Design a protein with these regions (language model features):
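Conserved Radical SAM active-site core
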Residues: 4-100
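Structured alpha-helical segments in the cores of large, soluble enzyme domains
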Residues: 29-36, 87-92, 119-132, 227
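Structural preference for beta-strand elements that scaffold enzyme active sites
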Residues: 40-44, 75-77, 96-100, 135-139, ...
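Conserved radical SAM core fold
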Residues: 49-52, 83-86, 99-116, 142-147, ...
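Non-cysteine beta-strand/loop elements that form the S-adenosyl-L-methionine
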Residues: 86-106, 173-180, 198-203
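A beta-strand-loop signature enriched in Asp, Gly, Thr, and Trp
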Residues: 127, 131-180
Length: 244
C-alpha cells in the first residue's frame, strides 16, 4: 500500500482492495454513456483501486477491456503501480484503452509505495503494453520532496530513458502530480505506521482547503520548472500533459 493514498482515509488505517460485484451493470452503463456524449470522451475507470492488482483476483479488467474494445466509444484509462500485464497483451482493445504506469524513484517505491512492483518491472510492463498496441503514458506521481529529491528524480528520468523501448519513447505522454497529504492521513499513518517515513514537512507544506497539506507554491514552482526542463532534455518530443 502507498502511505500517501487517499484510500487510507476512506478505509481507516489500510487501503483495502475494493471489489465490485455489479460489474456487468457498471460496464453496460459505461458503454451506454460513451455513446451519448457529444464528442468522444476518455473515461477514468481506476479511481477506487488498482485494476491491475484487482484483475489478479477477479479478471474484471480483462472483461472490461474486451467489452469496451468491441462496443465502447472513446477510450477508457487507468493508472497502476503493478506490472502483471501479461493477461492483457493479447486482448482486442482496438486502440480504446490508455494504460498509464505510475513511476517514482526506487527508494520511494520501496519505502513509501510498499508492496508495489519495482521500477524495472513497471518499465518492462510499459514496453510490453506499448508493443501490444495500447496507448501508454507515464504518471510521475506523486512527486515527493524527500531528502535529495532532485538527484532521485534525475536518476528516475535517466532510468526511464535507458530502459524504455524506442517504440515506447516515441509514443508515451507524461503527467506529473505533486503529492498532497491530508490531515487525517497524517494522523492515521502516525498511529498505524509509526516507523514509516514522515511525509508531512511543516517547512515545505501548508494547509489549503479540504483538510489537505500542499507543497508551498514557491517550492512547487521551482520543482515544476526543474522537472519540465529535465524531462524535455531526455524526451524532447514527448507531450507533458500537465503538471499539478
Amino acid at each position: 500500500m502507498c502511505l500517501y493514498c487517499y484510500l487510507v482515509c476512506n478505509y481507516n488505517k489500510c487501503s483495502y482492495l475494493r471489489v465490485y460485484v455489479n460489474t456487468d451493470y457498471m460496464l453496460d452503463k459505461l458503454i451506454e454513456k460513451s455513446h451519448k456524449t457529444e464528442k468522444e470522451c476518455t473515461f477514468e475507470i481506476g479511481s477506487n483501486s488498482d485494476l491491475i492488482l484487482e484483475n489478479r483476483i477477479t479478471g474484471n479488467l480483462i472483461k472490461t477491456i474486451k467489452e469496451f474494445g468491441r462496443k465502447g466509444r472513446g477510450c477508457i484509462t487507468f493508472p497502476t503501480k503493478f506490472a502483471m500485464v501479461d493477461d492483457l497483451l493479447g486482448l482486442e482493445h482496438n486502440g480504446k484503452v490508455i494504460f498509464r504506469m505510475s513511476v517514482n524513484p526506487e527508494s520511494i517505491i520501496k519505502n513509501i509505495e510498499i508492496g508495489t512492483s519495482p521500477l524495472e518491472m513497471r518499465i518492462e510492463a510499459v514496453n510490453k503494453m506499448c508493443e501490444a498496441g495500447y496507448k501508454v503514458g507515464l504518471l510521475i506521481a506523486p512527486v515527493i520532496f524527500t531528502d535529495g529529491w532532485k538527484e532521485l528524480y534525475l536518476e528516475l528520468l535517466d532510468t526511464l530513458y535507458s530502459r524504455l523501448s524506442e517504440k515506447a519513447k516515441s509514443e508515451i505522454f507524461i503527467e506529473v502530480i505533486f503529492m498532497t497529504y491530508s490531515y487525517v492521513q497524517n494522523a492515521i499513518n502516525e498511529q498505524a505506521f509509526p516507523n514509516a517515513p514522515k511525509l508531512y514537512d511543516k517547512e515545505l507544506m501548508t494547509g489549503r482547503g479540504r483538510g489537505k497539506y500542499y507543497y508551498r507554491q514557491e517550492y512547487r514552482d521551482e520543482a515544476e520548472k526543474f522537472l519540465r526542463e529535465e524531462i524535455t532534455k531526455r524526451f524532447s518530443g514527448t507531450e507533458i500533459v500537465y503538471v499539478v
